Curated annotation (Swiss-Prot):
Name of the protein this chain belongs to: Anthrone oxygenase dmxR16
PANTHER family for this protein: ANTHRONE OXYGENASE ENCC, ANTHRONE OXYGENASE-RELATED
Gene Ontology terms for molecular function: monooxygenase activity
Signal sequence annotation: none
Family stated for the protein in its record: Belongs to the anthrone oxygenase family.
Subcellular location: Membrane
EC number: 1.10.3.-
Enzyme class: oxidoreductase
Keywords, ordered alphabetically: Glycoprotein, Membrane, Monooxygenase, Oxidoreductase, Transmembrane, Transmembrane helix
Biological source species: Cryptosporiopsis sp. (strain 8999)
Gene: dmxR16
Function (record text): Anthrone oxygenase; part of the gene cluster that mediates the biosynthesis of the dimeric xanthones cryptosporioptides. The pathway begins with the synthesis of atrochrysone thioester by the polyketide synthase dmx-nrPKS. The atrochrysone carboxyl ACP thioesterase dmxR1 then breaks the thioester bond and releases the atrochrysone carboxylic acid from dmx-nrPKS. Atrochrysone carboxylic acid is decarboxylated by the decarboxylase dmxR15, and oxidized by the anthrone oxygenase dmxR16 to yield emodin. Emodin is then reduced to emodin hydroquinone by the oxidoreductase dmxR7.
Source species, domain of life: Eukaryota
Record's GO cellular component terms: membrane
Length: 171
């Protein structure tokens, strides 16, 4: 009779902390992808198909609205998972803390760099009958570049989280 191998001893233990990091890194990547989609697909469609500045502002406003409902909550939850992981990790706590801070950094980036453009677009929407398509396009393109830059924060957080979990699993 052949001896039974202990498969459980060969498989690295996942645990709650590592599962939290995997979830956080996954959520960071999903957030980055959703944000990049807006800049790389949605807004270019607005630019290619709109000839009416009021319609373009309305589309931008609705895109902002739905993104604002979903993405900040995911970002905060992701940061919480990274914080939990940092507190529970012995060796990679700095990497997990940095992943959380990096992911959450999109919030101050938004306040500092994007709020003026957002406010201008919202003011144009509230004013109603806007006639300068070129000006609206210029604002939307500026917002798109800022938004694409902002989407890098959760992407970097995801990379830090994934590299941290890979380092943990190697030990």
């Amino acid at each position: 009779m052949a001896p039974q191998t202990k498969r459980a001893a060969e498989t690295p233990k996942l645990g709650v902390q590592k599962a939290a990091v995997i979830a956080a890194a996954f959520l960071s990547a999903i957030t980055a992808g959703a944000m990049a989609n807006i800049s790389m697909i949605s807004v270019p469609v607005f630019m290619d198909t709109n000839t009416n500045p009021n319609h373009m502002i309305a589309q931008w406003s609705r895109t902002y609205h739905y993104g604002h409902i979903i993405l900040p909550g995911i970002c905060v939850g992701t940061c919480g998972l990274y914080a939990f992981s940092a507190l529970r990790s012995n060796k990679n706590w700095r990497r997990y803390a940095l992943a959380g801070i990096t992911t959450l950094s999109l919030v101050p980036f938004t306040w500092v760099f994007m709020t003026p453009t957002n406010n201008t677009l919202f003011a144009l929407e509230a004013a109603g009958n806007v006639s300068d398509l070129g000006y609206v396009q210029q604002l939307v393109v500026k917002w798109t570049w800022l938004h694409a830059t902002r989407s890098m924060f959760p992407l970097i957080g995801a990379i830090l989280g994934f590299t941290g979990i890979m380092a943990d699993l190697e030990r």
